[in-house]
């Protein structure tokens, strides 16, 4: 049978209230008694029931990360950064991967509201009406919420993003500096603020250089290797550009694979630049030039804002914008004339 709080209290020779105070770190308890109870809990492999804590309105010491695709190294590395910091602060972390599915997103929001987690971090676009409504309900419950890598100005949450406009601008400027003007963009569905801002920065750099943009070279696809490879292949078969700006490293690697299948050499025949600077960028062949997002800093900033919010020192929403950085490797080179 599973060990209960009653079993722990009996074995430690204390009241159930005392065990509860040790678990929740509340009330006045001597160090000797606290250590005795903790030793018994360890010996009996007792795990506090977080669901019961949620029902009584107590802290569950759990936070949740809602991400669109945890198999994408960007979100995997982001989750690792947040989890490490959460562990230092005494929190456990739940990870909800929505697979870009609004129905899954809404379902997770409902579950997290019921569990009364102590905070929720969103790394999804939250575009559907149902998701927005569910999120507004969570906000009304006074659950601390924050958003990373996305921006929803009308929602009452802390936001940690990078300067996506600058990132798109730097990517285009790099390719232009190498002599490329026939540049394609491989994006997602274009609905998120991050995508919109990256294309805004890209357009700004092209306009400053006096280079017209071929709208047929702005390709939409799902943020997956398979979809990216398919759409990049169609692009290369139809009207091969001399350079591609992919909106994440997964799509950039997909473009490299599509080029290799067609005997197009990267970077001799085709320059490719990605976005994120995940482990994929280093492992790609050739190693990928990319715009780096400061993933660790994004996770750390999220916890700093959450700490201020949970301590009641700040009620106003805070937006933190971090700078991107161009990382030049071997997937881009001067235009081969």
Curated annotation (Swiss-Prot):
It comes from the Bacteria. One of its GO terms (molecular function) is DNA-binding transcription factor activity. GO terms for biological process: regulation of DNA-templated transcription. Residues 300-319 are annotated as: Disordered. Disulfide bonds: none annotated. SMART domains: HTH_LACI (SM00354). Pfam families: LacI, Peripla_BP_3. Keywords: Activator, DNA-binding, Repressor, Transcription, Transcription regulation. Residues 1-57 form the HTH lacI-type domain. Transmembrane segments: none annotated. Residues 5-24 bind DNA. PANTHER family: HTH-TYPE TRANSCRIPTIONAL REGULATOR DEGA, LACI-RELATED TRANSCRIPTIONAL REPRESSOR. Involved in the control of degradation of B.subtilis amidophosphoribosyltransferase (purF). Probably activates the gene for a degradative protease. This is HTH-type transcriptional regulator DegA. It comes from Bacillus subtilis (strain 168).
